[in-house]
Amino acid sequence: MHQHPRSPAPTAPTSSARPNSSRSRELDYRPNSPAADVRVHNSRGLGIETEPDSSGQTVQPAKEAIAKLNQIISNYHTKAALIILHSRIELPPSFNKGSDTPRVNRWFNVEIEDTDVLREQLRTWRTCDATENRPPPLIIETYLDTKGLTNNQTLVALDENGKRWDVLEALAASQQAHPVRPPSASSDDVILERWRVELGDTSNALPADLGSILPTVYKKSIVLFRSLFTYSKFLPAWKFAKRNGRLRANPALRIKYRIIIGSPNQVSSKPDHLTMPLYESSSKVVETYSFGVTDSPAGPFSAQVTYRTSCDFRVDDSEALLSSRFMGADDEIFRPSLPTRVVDSKVPPPEIGSLPQERRTIEDPDPGRAYGSLSTFHQVGPTTSASPISALRAKGKLGTSSPSSPGSSSRKALAVAKASPVGRAAALASEGSPGVVRRPSISFQPFKAPPLSASPSLVDPPLSSPRSVSGPRPHPPMAASARKSFPAVQDNSIASPSSASPRPSSISRYSSAFSHRRGRPSSGGINKLEDDTSSGKASATSSAQPGSGLLAEPTGTSADSIHADDENISEFLKMLDLRKDLLNTSGSAALDATARRTTVTSAALTRFQRMRDSNAALSDSMSSSLLLQRSSNSSSKQLSGVPPMVAGTSISTASSPGKPISPHTPHTPAIPSRLSSNSIVDYTHSEGNGTELSQGHGSPLDENTSDGTTMEHGPSAVNAIDIPTSPRLFPPVYRRSSSAAHRPRTVAVDDDEIFPFNRSVSLGAEERSNLSLGALHRQHEYESSDTATHRAQREPRPMSSNEDAVVPPSSITRGQGSHKGVTPGPTVASSSSSHHHVYQPRFSHSRGRGSSGGHHSLSSGSSSLARGAAITPGLAERESERDGNGSGSNSVTSAMEDRRGVGRRPSAGRGGPPQSAQLEEDEPLLFAMSDFGASRRSFEEGKHVNHAHDPTGNIAGSRRGGSSRRGGGFHAWS
């Protein structure tokens, strides 16, 4: 009875062993899932039922553990291949059935898109196991295939210095040295990397606790694949693949791969394309990185990579690579002999703050100067002449186009440029350097004579024209025989000297087209001195700007700034004699170059040709005006301001005949026009007796008045050129004086009908003071009574050169008469001095050139005469005697006293001497108007006070009429 209750005890462990075995059977199928190794053998730590466990291990647990181990081995290889190839190559994704979502491989806790492309290539590793079919080593090679290159393309490798190396040539050289090559590589592949994933051999049998070891193997593999995923993006091949993917490079640069079944035993003695050096370098060709070993019951898992340290490849042109090798551009063994500009060390550097002194030599011109724009072509280097005609001739060689050496005229040209504005412009036009490149321009003045404001300034040194800078020109006879060696131009025409119109070329050598004008009385001086000192050089020589090309002077461009001395001229002539064929027109290329250069110069010549008719009409008008004037003045007038031997005393319209000839003579034509009121200026004096009024001042008006006759003179007989004046904001009060306003006008009584229209508005044509006999008589009476008062008031004071004023007659009369209602009396064409013409300025402070007589001479004393006064013969004799004895200093002093005491001289037109209070009222107004117009003084002030005296004591520069007015107000014609 005791054993009966103990009978069911053995049945309990038996029943408990069944669920234990069934649970272990379920665990054998769990390795199909990555998380299956978590709950393996939960009841194994109890220490009981050891026999059933041992019997169960031999049956089912081994199969389940082996299945799990086989899954780990298979995914180990496939996952490594996906990570390596996805980082180098774009693999197409795979999709599940009925879904558009790409299938993702999540083994070893690394998510990556799965692909079906590698399924067949990795079939060997997908079907392997740990016991019977062990996997071979997985080898993945990435490489560049050169089969896609064309015949003119070459795969080159760049070293660390950027030098190009032919890859195929390096591979061929290595194959000759090592004919044996691995079977996996072809002859035209460049292997970049070689990956090796391998399961090592094991000598031990599978352990009994295989199920408990597999979760540890899985966890260790997660760390391996994460490091593989990261490190694969640090290698040079990945950088090379990404760069080509962005640039869309040549197809030959796309990385390709191949999966190779590796051999268990590597043969390192055989060279392969991975370890072949492509160029000489001190660095390693390849490097190897191992990811460590992961132990498993089936054997050690390992992964390593061998990669090229430099993957800088590109595809270049084969011919470019070959030529660079021949030229030695890469290895710097041979440098091409490219011409370099050598700077002459003997040439001094340019001065600081000045124009560049140096110019390019004849042999080394600047080619950049040849093309000024898209449509213009210019001759390179300095030209032999700036004339438009010689520009047509300049078809010679490049080196022979310049007659001078560099720097031959720089010093002297700059010295001239500092002296005068004209020379400065010429020096700027003539200087040439790589930094400052200037071309001669062709321009014309719109007028045949410059305006009055263009007269040379008195403060400039006597450099009248650009041509007066250099030495003398060749004389026309010499110049006529000098151009014989020049061949005829294609159009066989040069510019005419006077009208610039093309005509058949006269045989002359080295002569300027404008060196002298036509041989008529109106032409300029024959020699240089006369041409330089004439005031009418406005047509060809003065009107053209420096460097314009109109002045084809023998010594270079205008202003002679290229050749400034006779030595350079002689060298130029010698060079022309040596080079007889300098301007030969042989060859069609030279003719084509001429046609291109003719475009600018022909237009300039055509424009200047249209000025011929007006210039000829001007010359004829000037000639007739001169002849009529000289025939009317039959008192044997001579040029008093010029020495008798000075060239230029011959009458010429190019120079004002009566004015002292100087380089600063204003360019004013000697014909009546609206630019000048007095046609001809003549510093002459009559050599008759001293009782005539013309002896003191040479006034033909006094002769006409005393004789009572009427003479018709040249200016009134010639039709005036109607030159319109510019509109002005204010009345024409503050006008400059004209250079032609210094000659006594011989005007008849009936000029009243002509001169309001033919007289110059700028010289006050509306301000004529024609005094009647009654007015002159009353003026004489007041003059005799006021003599003592004005003499007591005179005090000598020095007078500046630009304030030698004369008191005009009608200023106070008009100024007071306009307020008091005094109407001028009948007009008579008479004047009282040579520098008081038919018109008179309004105020008495107009700037004259100085009075030749005393204070009460007719030139100064007439300022206090009213229009209704009369002049008696006694007064004329007394004033004439005083004028004959007056000196230059007295005239200056008296002229200044006239200006100072002008406010105290009342007009007799009011019936008698006014009170002193009324005299002082006008004085502030007169001086205020004088200060108001002080800025508009003439250019010619202050120059003529110091002129030479004539034999009777008169100052040559004192024939200055009151042509510049300083007062306002309207004056009605009387």
From Swiss-Prot:
Compositional bias of kind Low complexity: 12-22, 401-410, 450-470, 493-514, 535-544, 629-640, 854-870
Localization, UniProt: Cytoplasm; Preautophagosomal structure
Family to which this protein belongs: Belongs to the ATG13 family. Fungi subfamily.
Compositional bias of kind Basic residues: 834-848
GO BP: any one term: piecemeal microautophagy of the nucleus
Name of the protein this chain belongs to: Autophagy-related protein 13
Function of the protein: Plays a key role in autophagy. Activates the atg1 kinase in a nutritional condition dependent manner through the TOR pathway, leading to autophagy. Also involved in cytoplasm to vacuole transport (Cvt) and more specifically in Cvt vesicle formation. Seems to play a role in the switching machinery regulating the conversion between the Cvt pathway and autophagy. Finally, atg13 is also required for glycogen storage during stationary phase.
Basic and acidic residues compositional bias, start-end: 357-367, 779-797, 937-950
Lineage of the species this protein comes from: Eukaryota, Fungi, Dikarya, Ascomycota, Pezizomycotina
Protein source organism: Aspergillus oryzae (strain ATCC 42149 / RIB 40) (Yellow koji mold)
UniProt xrefs under InterPro entries: ATG13, Atg13_N, HORMA_dom_sf
Record's compositionally biased regions (Polar residues): 373-388, 674-709
Domain of life assignment: Eukaryota
Consequences of knocking out this gene: Decreases the level of autophagy. Still enables the autophagic process to proceedeto completion but limits the induction of autophagy.
Subunit structure: Interacts with atg1 to form the atg1-atg13 kinase complex.
Region listing for Disordered, in residue ranges: 1-60, 341-563, 629-712, 779-974
Cellular component GO terms held in the UniProt record: Atg1/ULK1 kinase complex; cytosol; phagophore assembly site
Compositionally skewed regions (Gly residues) per UniProt: 964-974
Record keywords, A-Z: Autophagy, Cytoplasm, Protein transport, Transport
Keyword Flavoprotein among UniProt keywords: no
This protein's record includes keyword Transport: yes
